[in-house]
């Protein structure tokens, strides 16, 4: 797609500035050259049109890389309506280029909470009425939740949802356990080519970039505390170590904690003896008083709570690279401390009280992206080559679920198919192979004898489902 002029009469969009479309198109063309798996799928399935008839409601960060995803879905036959899953993550030139191509999109950087909710609604509604959508592509679960809560009739036609991130998967599993989930879901997050690329290697690239853009600080020689050591935490700790920081890790899971130790990070707790009693007395003030940077990576609530924020070193930087803004207790900061905007998505939080502040006061914290996703709030997120794997998984998951035609099944068949599952390993390997080819790599093929010896086929899949990469 190369159009940059909005089709005559097309008004089914809202973006910051449609005149940015040409800029967005130029960046999209570059991104396509860095997304070999996604573009490979576009070429492979173009003639087949496996998404013909698919009407996809999409809610994922409206970035340049997402523009390539959207146009791949459309190229394979789908119609889409789109919004962003974060109020700060949209790249306005990307949204403009999609609108200029005649694709409904409702997203701009710096939305208010009310505007965010409005954009979600417009994704679902066409001409004021629910669109006859039959697929969902989500990141974080807000769109899926809104459909279940307010537009359940739409779900009668929906074949399934593909979910991008850890937080959204947790919400889906919770809904499934409570009997509230109405459609099957593919857990894209736990595909190897998503979790190991996006969550780990992506954060390794983009966290330090966002912090440096937001603060202009030299990070070398300073002390950082990374809260959480899952895939996002692992990538984040590596990102800061690359900058020469002295990195400590806090974890609740003994296995992840062991991995942090094995990777050479000091395992600590912000709480004395590791126990949070909800009081200032339980805080390890000696530890937090030396921390220059704290990063939350968990997808959990209040992992950097009010008592920790009180004990942090003066002028420490605080940020989050998990999906939602509740990992850091920003509600406490808004209620009790004064906020001074330095520039968009960078605030000095004066710990001298909620009222007026002295600009020369040195008892403040630097909060990035208001506690929301820092790498997209203060920078441009993961590079195209990283998102290539994630979005190739999304395309294959959409094709897979759309082909299952869940909405057309009998009640008995629906009950059997109502699951939250990962993408079949063979498709995960298909994405990986396209990515390897994009790097110019050559994968060695097993001989028939070798394949028989380890109990697989020459074409794969090569590992059992329980294998941990």
Swiss-Prot record:
EC main group: hydrolase
Cofactor dependency: NAD(+)
Cellular location(s): Cytoplasm
Keywords: Cytoplasm, Hydrolase, NAD, One-carbon metabolism
Enzyme Commission number(s) from the entry: 3.13.2.1
Top-level taxon: Bacteria
Pathway: Amino-acid biosynthesis; L-homocysteine biosynthesis; L-homocysteine from S-adenosyl-L-homocysteine: step 1/1
Co-factor: note: Binds 1 NAD(+) per subunit.
Positions with a binding annotation for substrate: 63, 139, 164, 194, 198
Any one GO CC term of the record: cytosol
Reactions catalysed, as given in the entry: S-adenosyl-L-homocysteine + H2O = L-homocysteine + adenosine
GO process annotations (BP): L-homocysteine biosynthetic process; one-carbon metabolic process; S-adenosylmethionine cycle
Residues that, per the record, bind NAD(+): 165-167, 199, 228-233, 251, 300, 321-323, 375
Entry keyword NAD: yes
UniProt GO MF annotations: adenosylhomocysteinase activity
Role: May play a key role in the regulation of the intracellular concentration of adenosylhomocysteine.
HAMAP family for this protein: AdoHcyase
UniProt similarity note: Belongs to the adenosylhomocysteinase family.
Protein name: Adenosylhomocysteinase
Organism: Pseudomonas fluorescens (strain ATCC BAA-477 / NRRL B-23932 / Pf-5)
């Amino acid at each position: 797609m190369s159009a940059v002029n909005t089709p005559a009469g097309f008004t089914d969009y809202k973006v910051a500035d449609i005149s940015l479309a040409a800029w967005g198109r130029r960046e999209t063309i570059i991104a396509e050259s860095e997304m070999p798996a996604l573009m490979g799928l576009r070429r492979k399935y173009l003639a087949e049109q496996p998404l013909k008839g698919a009407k996809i409601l999409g809610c994922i960060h409206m970035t340049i890389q997402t523009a390539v995803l959207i146009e791949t879905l459309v190229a394979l036959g789908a119609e889409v309506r789109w919004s962003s899953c974060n109020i700060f993550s949209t790249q306005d030139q990307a949204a403009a280029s999609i609108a200029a191509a005649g694709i409904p999109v409702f997203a701009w950087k710096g939305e208010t909470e009310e505007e965010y909710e409005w954009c979600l609604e417009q994704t679902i509604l066409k001409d004021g009425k629910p669109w006859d959508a039959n697929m969902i592509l989500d990141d974080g679960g807000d769109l899926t939740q809104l459909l279940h809560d307010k537009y359940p009739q739409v779900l009668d036609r929906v074949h399934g949802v593909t979910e991008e991130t850890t937080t959204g998967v947790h919400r889906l599993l919770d809904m499934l356990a409570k009997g509230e989930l109405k459609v099957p879901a593919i857990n894209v997050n736990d595909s190897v080519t998503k979790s190991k690329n996006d969550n780990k290697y992506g954060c390794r690239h983009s966290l330090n970039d966002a912090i440096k853009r937001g603060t202009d600080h030299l990070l070398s020689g300073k002390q950082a505390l990374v809260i959480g050591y899952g895939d996002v935490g692992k990538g984040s700790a590596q990102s800061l170590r690359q900058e020469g920081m002295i990195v400590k890790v806090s974890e609740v899971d003994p296995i992840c904690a062991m991995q942090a130790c094995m990777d050479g990070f000091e395992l600590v707790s912000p709480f004395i003896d590791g126990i949070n009693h909800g009081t200032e007395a339980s805080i390890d003030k000696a530890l937090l008083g030396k921390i220059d940077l704290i990063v939350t990576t968990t997808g959990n609530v209040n992992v950097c709570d009010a008592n920790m924020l009180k004990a942090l070193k003066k002028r420490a930087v605080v940020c989050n690279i998990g999906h939602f803004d509740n990992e850091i207790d920003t509600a406490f900061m808004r209620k009790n401390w004064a906020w001074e905007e330095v520039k968009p998505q960078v605030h000095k939080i004066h710990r001298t009280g909620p009222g007026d502040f002295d600009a020369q006061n040195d008892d403040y914290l630097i909060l990035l992206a208001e506690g929301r996703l820092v790498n997209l709030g203060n920078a441009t997120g993961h590079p195209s080559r990283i998102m290539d794997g994630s979005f190739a998984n999304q395309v294959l998951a959409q094709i897979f679920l759309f082909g299952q035609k869940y909405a057309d099944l009998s009640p008995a068949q629906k009950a059997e198919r109502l699951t939250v599952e990962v993408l079949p390993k063979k498709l995960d390997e298909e994405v990986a192979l396209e990515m390897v080819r994009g790097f110019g790599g050559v994968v060695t093929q097993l001989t028939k004898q070798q394949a028989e010896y380890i109990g697989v086929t020459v074409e794969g899949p090569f590992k059992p489902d329980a294998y941990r990469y």
